[in-house]
């Protein structure tokens, strides 16, 4: 992932799997390693079922996180990592709306949307 200072950080997981449709594509991740200070934001999604705007599987009782945070994902209650939010340009990315955009909360917080990110499954 790249922030708006063009600083690059990374996170890697030794185990990543997505369950079958019958289990709503439940995510399982473990074995985190990453660049200094990045924090393991994706592990908060481990064990969660996939949520979309029309099919809510998150643990938030009052709302659908996929609607609130503008993108489908394996949400718990609040997104610690949300790569599918609406892309924000520089003027909107820092200090903008709470948890909107592309976030990796444990390093950048909820008011910072990343400039770039890439996710690979090998």
Role assignments for model-derived ranges:
Residues 1-122:
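Mature extracellular or lumenal effector domains of secreted proteins
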